[in-house]
Amino acid sequence: MKIKASQQAAFEHLLDISVQISKESNIDILMEKILMASVEISNADAGSIYLVNQSKELEFRTVYNDSMGLHLGGSSAEKITFPSVPLFVDDKPNRTAIVAHAANSGEVINIEDVYDALPYDFSAARTMDTKTGYRTKSMLTFPLKDHTDDIVGVIQLINAMEGNEIISFSKQVENQILSFASLGAIALTNKALIFNMEQLFESFAKTIAAAIDAKSPHTGGHCKRVPELTLMIADAVHDYDEGPLATFKLSDEERHQLNIAGWLHDCGKIATPDHVIEKSRKLQTIFDRIHYVSAKLEIASRDIDLAVQDEIIAALKLGKTVQVQQLERKREVAQKQLQLDKAFLLRVNIGGEFLTDEQAQMIHTIATRYQITLDSERQNVLTTNEIDNLSVKRGTLNNEERSIIQKHMDVTLNILEALPFPKHLANVAEYALGHHETMDGKGYPRGLVKAQMSVPARLMAIADVFEALSASDRPYKSAKPVSECLTIMSNMVKNNHLDPDLFTIFVRSKVYEKYIHKFADPKQIDDFNIEAILPTT
């Protein structure tokens, strides 16, 4: 059968429109394109497109009227304020609203003159016509069906035009529109499926982060705050037009990947033992053993009293009253020293300050200064394990526990590399795994150097460190002022741990102020000399 040139041209035009629609990734713009293509194919003067929402209502997404110069929703800056149309009224299908009836019945409704169309309620259209002087006449309403034949939306076209005359929508136009609508519905469904899958994956990532935060009230919120700070830094670098990173620009796709990476950056901690994550004191295991040490010191205190008491009794028997007074002073001095030693151990157990060599030696001295009898065995008041834990230089974790914590990145690596990320999320693993790497290659889990890491991977380390330093929910330290946080980070830059260019932008753009105001105490923002903190070139 020979196809007429006009039909061939129409077919090719329809195909071209369909291709354009299939490439659109923004659902709002996609729906607008479907509507505008329908208006063009039918030569309609006006039209609206609706999407079925979760409340079982038809929600306006784009409204267009050529004669009135009206364009709402979609790419327009004008928002739609019209109320959604319920599909059901009193639990029964809404058959008075024509768009609802088309959705509920799955039927195409072609009306020559809406003023004569019963039983549909066109009172709103009449009222609007009276106010505007417009005349709503012919109308074509048809549902958009997905691959399972479910209704995903409705298109309503108003006033087919032939020159300046309003005519009816012909059967030929109706068939053309339905053919196109099927393609449009498929494109819309595909985009909705992709969007829903992405929402599901992002929600899953956030759920994992929430579960990890819930493991410890002392670090709770870390997995939530890091992604937000990461994006704040990324936006600052994107906008910064000076220095080595002046040409760095973050696409929407890369920004989305960085957001997902932020939520998943510590996912390996789900396998880290709770008592290690929760370790808020140096002697803590399942419980804080400082109470056990205190009990042993109480025994030592009792032993001092008993030993001196025995000496006093012996002196009294010999009538040496002067010696008794000396023994009383001896007991007083010994007990005072014991209380000082106890207070010292309680303080260093917190782990909030760097432990000096002198303090470490003091722990060993205290350990041998007092002996007690336990299980018929005479022993030092502190065990080797207790000495080792109390002697941790910084924080509360000993070497073995720190190794366990670091292994969370191995678990994170295994989890993320096992996930079959689609192309548009291909960089998530690389971004997420960068926050414990260092510029000199001495970090973990892969020991990468700066040149082997992308900018997003390197900036996540800045976010991770600043969040940890500025946090007020760590039990072993109070919230640090910004100046102290940045000074510590500046030293990390000097030691080739953090990226100097990213740190410079972080400081000069004052990202820390925005973050502190949102997630911490504004009182932490203090005065300091920015130039003294910035790395020297």
Predicted regions and their residues:
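Signal-transmission linkers at sensory-effector interfaces
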Residues: 1-33, 37-41, 62, 193-207, ...
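GAF sensory/regulatory domain recognition
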Residues: 48-93, 116-117, 288-291, 296, ...
